[in-house]
């Protein structure tokens, strides 16, 4: 009986450890295409402009080494610019590269990805969890305005 419990525990542990493990080896052309669309384009959700004349924008750069940089750019009503960077790690959570994983229980479930749009459901929590929350988000290629 003890051997069965140990065997079951090992199997369960292997399943949990295999989740969200970065793929080793070569990628096929479809996988390379998804990686290129995510990493070769700088993405933004767009500039949010407020009634007082201030604005805010979040700019995302993903690297093929599994890291990202999110730059938050805030411009106050007087035109003063303030930037802050957040760095983190990401990986694919599913074998078909349809979900990005950021750690903890934070995921992006990709809805559409091409050269003009990166749309996804920003999800916190596991699928089928009644406490899971998600929000639809659209990113577009970032074009820095020239002053």
What function would you assign to each model-found segment?
Residues 1-18:
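Sec-dependent bacterial lipoprotein signal peptides
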Residues 20-87, 93-147:
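Lipid interaction determinants
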């Amino acid at each position: 009986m003890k051997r069965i419990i140990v065997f079951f525990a090992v199997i369960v542990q292997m399943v949990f450890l295999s989740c969200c493990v970065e793929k080793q080896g070569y990628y096929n052309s479809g996988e390379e295409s998804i990686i290129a669309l995510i990493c070769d384009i700088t993405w933004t959700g767009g500039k949010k402009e407020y009634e007082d004349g201030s604005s805010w924008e979040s700019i995302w750069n993903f690297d093929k080494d599994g890291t990202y940089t999110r730059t938050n750019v805030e411009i106050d009503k007087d035109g003063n610019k303030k930037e802050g960077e957040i760095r983190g790690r990401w990986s694919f959570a599913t074998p078909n590269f349809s979900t990005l994983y950021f750690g903890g229980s934070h995921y992006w479930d990709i809805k559409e990805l091409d050269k003009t749009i990166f749309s996804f459901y920003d999800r916190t929590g596991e699928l089928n969890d009644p406490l899971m929350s998600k929000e639809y988000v659209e990113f577009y290629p970032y074009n820095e305005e020239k002053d």
